[in-house]
């Protein structure tokens, strides 16, 4: 009887350890996207001109729209006219619209010679902001209300001025949420490889 008990205990310990190992591995994997209600991640990035990013305190009271993009991303490029229009339509509202890429500033400036962007452009050149926002399935646009609560994570073309005005009024409109990227670890690896290649060609800034 004692031997049977020892065997059962040993088996239970092995199963528990295996489950714990799987949990640990899962926790290390990047998530598909930032969940609604998440704690505001740090804004570890700089403007295209090299100045520091605004803090959440600076942005308090505003609806903050953060669009994650890249110059090689076709859907991102297709979304630029829509975001430009959104910026213009909401110009008289307490709204900040930030476009965030991880690419070197020199590459972005080259891109802007042929693509007009009205949004405020920021560079996350170590991918820390992409990581903290789980922004691997680009383009993805996060919307924070005036209290800094994440109220939407959508494809940019699904965000309209009418929706933003509802958020300004304190409403939480129902939106088709961006599902994130099915392989965030693979996307993160690809972004890092792209960044290294870009640095060889354009430098770090």
Where are these regions (language model features)?
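C-terminal segment of classical bacterial N-terminal signal peptides
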Residues: 14-23
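Thiol-based oxidoreductase modules, predominantly thioredoxin-like and allied folds used
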Residues: 93-107, 117-127
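N-terminal "domain-start" segment that seeds a small globular fold
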Residues: 24-56
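Bacterial N-terminal signal peptides that target proteins for export
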Residues: 1-8
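Short pre-active-site segment immediately N-terminal to redox-active cysteine/selenocysteine motifs
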Residues: 62-64, 68-72, 104, 137
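Conserved redox-active cysteine motifs that mediate thiol-disulfide chemistry
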Residues: 68-85
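Thiol/disulfide oxidoreductase modules built on the thioredoxin-like
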Residues: 111-118, 124-168
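Thiol-/selenol-based redox modules, centered on thioredoxin-like
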Residues: 146-205
